[in-house]
């Protein structure tokens, strides 16, 4: 078993069984080389290039521009792996969802999961790509302990989709505006296993549960110029795969992983600079900060006449120090010795198959944003509502029940969003229905209840469910709209507060708010606020 898991490995390995599961342990020589290389890189980092992330934008303004591209790996939410029938579930016991095929045993043959092809075509269409009617698989060969076959099944020269683009809208706080970033290609491949490192750093264990899990790699054009643009591109891609249902897109689980290529060049120069790949970024915020730091590092080397120190390499982002460090020299395509996968036939598609997928596509984030924008909503509202497909569906359903778009957006973005944040819930986990939100909005607009009472009812509906009508009747919350009743309460409040009334007459007109509050308190929040302010104003004017 150990020889199969790590065949071709020249460093001693130890295999052991624990609770019925195999663990393969990588002894210290190879691991030590990796660790020593990273530590030496940290120690050797020149003091002059250890810049704070916030300086990146200032450095960029000094005659240079960044050129940024992203390679994104999306783990597909299929029932089984790409080339075998093993299931995969994040967090499973190590080496519990493996078989001879995904473990790379000699003589085993891969069988393509048709769902992987469907997901690839679906994402390719969503990215406005040209879909290849015929594509093929290739072997990408390299050595690493978590790659038991010694190669990865991928696609090289004929990907399933190419030459597309992704549209997005930048948030106002990042400058706003529309952006379009090119997509070079989308291709299918399998994932590798995972190394589990010991706390002491003296050994690593190999978990092959992830080996063979289907991935789609999306390669962007080098169209981005800032860390913010790159982070927003990644966030939009995450949004897209979630809308499509092809992946959960969770970065924390490794379902969406972004490797960034960064280079800088003098403004006006057409040739690209030497690109550096950055890995180990587990959030979109980290992507932005890592890129900004790397831009600063490269620009400073240029300005100090040390541009030759920028080499094609892979660097790791270190969250604690907020810096990038050398991991390894970057391989070229020739190093992988690609050649066609002999055990898999070509993937041949038909126009009918592609049309069927196209016709089943949901409304995508870009189209949804444009539709919401046409309702007269601000871009801030649009971005919030379209960010999560569940929120967007809740909003749409509320409108279908007759609610005003702006009022519905305000409730969802305000009180409902605050509740979800505090309780750490998603909108599909609460008991409030779109119908009842629509009824709540209508009850406030027609004067049945006040806005203040509406907020109280909302919390009850979110937590316990029920209907607006039943809560109003049960708690006697119908708004008081009888002028005589409100006038009587105003008279009583003015009579009970002679000192404040005298101060009002002396010019402290802000006390009108105090009197209004006392009336609302007396009415238990049920007094019609418009009618209350009208009657109170008339009474105060008469008493002046």
From Swiss-Prot:
Q: What is its EC number?
A: 6.3.5.-
Misc. comment: This protein may be expected to contain an N-terminal transit peptide but none has been predicted.
**GO MF assignments:** ATP binding; glutaminyl-tRNA synthase (glutamine-hydrolyzing) activity
Q: One short Pfam family name for this protein?
A: GatB_Yqey
Q: Which protein are we looking at?
A: Glutamyl-tRNA(Gln) amidotransferase subunit B, chloroplastic/mitochondrial
Swiss-Prot/TrEMBL keywords: ATP-binding, Chloroplast, Ligase, Mitochondrion, Nucleotide-binding, Plastid, Protein biosynthesis
Localization, per the record, is: Mitochondrion; Plastid, Chloroplast
Disulfide connectivity? none
Provide the coiled-coil residue spans.
none
Asked if the keyword Chloroplast belongs to this entry, the reply reads yes
Q: Which GO terms describe its biological process?
A: glutaminyl-tRNAGln biosynthesis via transamidation; mitochondrial translation
GO CC annotation: chloroplast; glutamyl-tRNA(Gln) amidotransferase complex; mitochondrion
Domain of life of the native organism: Eukaryota
Q: How does it assemble?
A: Subunit of the heterotrimeric GatCAB amidotransferase (AdT) complex, composed of A, B and C subunits.
What InterPro entries would the database entry show? Asn/Gln-tRNA_amidoTrfase_suB/E (IPR017959), Asn/Gln-tRNA_Trfase_suB/E_cat (IPR006075), Asn/Gln_amidotransferase (IPR018027), Asn/Gln_tRNA_amidoTrase-B-like (IPR003789), GatB (IPR004413), GatB_C_1 (IPR042114), GatB_Yqey_C_2 (IPR023168), Gln-tRNA_amidoTrfase_suB_CS (IPR017958)
Q: Which reaction does it catalyse?
A: L-glutamyl-tRNA(Gln) + L-glutamine + ATP + H2O = L-glutaminyl-tRNA(Gln) + L-glutamate + ADP + phosphate + H(+)
Spell out the family assignment given in the record's similarity comment. Belongs to the GatB/GatE family. GatB subfamily.
Give the function comment from the record. Allows the formation of correctly charged Gln-tRNA(Gln) through the transamidation of misacylated Glu-tRNA(Gln) in chloroplasts and mitochondria. The reaction takes place in the presence of glutamine and ATP through an activated gamma-phospho-Glu-tRNA(Gln).
């Amino acid at each position: 078993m150990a020889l199969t898991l790590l065949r071709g490995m020249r460093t001693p390995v130890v295999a052991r069984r624990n609770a019925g599961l195999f663990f393969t342990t990588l002894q210290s020589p190879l691991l030590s080389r990796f660790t020593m290389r990273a530590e030496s890189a940290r120690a050797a980092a020149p003091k002059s290039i250890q810049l704070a992330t916030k300086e990146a934008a200032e450095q960029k303004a000094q005659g240079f521009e960044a050129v940024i591209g992203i390679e994104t790996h999306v783990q597909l939410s299929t029932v089984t792996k790409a080339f075998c029938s093993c299931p995969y579930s994040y967090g499973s016991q190590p080496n519990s969802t493996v078989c001879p095929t995904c473990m790379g045993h000699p003589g085993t043959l891969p069988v393509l999961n048709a769902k992987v092809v469907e997901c690839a075509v679906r994402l390719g269409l969503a990215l406005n790509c040209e879909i290849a009617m015929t594509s093929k698989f290739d072997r990408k060969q390299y050595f690493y302990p978590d790659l038991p076959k010694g190669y990865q099944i991928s696609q090289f020269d004929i990907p399933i989709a190419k030459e597309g683009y992704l549209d997005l809208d930048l948030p106002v706080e990042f400058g706003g505006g529309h952006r379009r970033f090119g997509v070079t290609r989308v291709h299918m491949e399998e994932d590798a296993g995972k190394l589990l490192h010991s706390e002491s750093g003296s050994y690593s264990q190999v978990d092959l549960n992830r080996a063979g899990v289907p991935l789609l790699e999306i390669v962007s054009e080098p169209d981005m110029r800032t860390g913010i643009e790159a982070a927003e591109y990644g966030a939009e891609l995450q949004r897209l795969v979630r809308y499509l249902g092809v992946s959960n897109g969770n970065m924390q689980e490794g379902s969406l992983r972004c490797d960034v290529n960064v280079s800088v060049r003098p403004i006006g120069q057409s040739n690209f600079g030497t690109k550096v790949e950055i890995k180990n970024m587990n959030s979109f915020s980290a992507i932005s900060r890592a890129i900004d730091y790397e831009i600063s590092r490269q620009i400073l080397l240029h300005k100090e006449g040390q541009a030759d120190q920028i080499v094609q390499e892979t660097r790791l982002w270190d969250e604690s120090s907020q810096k990038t460090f050398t991991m390894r020299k970057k391989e070229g395509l020739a190093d992988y010795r690609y050649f066609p996968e002999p055990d898999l036939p070509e993937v041949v598609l038909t126009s009918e198959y592609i049309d069927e997928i196209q016709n089943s596509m949901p409304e995508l984030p870009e189209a949804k944003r444009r539709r919401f924008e046409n309702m007269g909503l601000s871009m801030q509202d649009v971005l919030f509502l379209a960010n999560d497909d569940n929120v967007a569906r809740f909003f749409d359903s509320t409108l279908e029940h007759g609610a005003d778009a702006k009022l519905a957006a305000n409730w969802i973005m305000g009180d409902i969003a605050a509740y979800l944040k505090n309780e750490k819930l998603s909108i599909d986990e609460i008991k409030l229905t779109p119908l009842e939100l629509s009824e709540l909005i209508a009850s406030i607009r027609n004067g049945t209840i006040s806005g203040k009472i509406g907020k109280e009812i909302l919390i009850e509906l979110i937590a316990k469910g029920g209907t607006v009508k039943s809560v109003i009747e049960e708690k006697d919350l119908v708004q008081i709209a009888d002028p005589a009743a409100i006038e009587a309460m105003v008279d009583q409040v003015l009579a009970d507060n002679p000192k404040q009334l005298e101060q009002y007459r002396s010019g402290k007109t802000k006390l009108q708010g105090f009197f209004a509050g006392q009336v609302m308190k007396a009415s238990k929040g049920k007094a019609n606020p418009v009618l209350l302010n009208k009657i109170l104003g008339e009474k105060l004017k008469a008493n002046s």
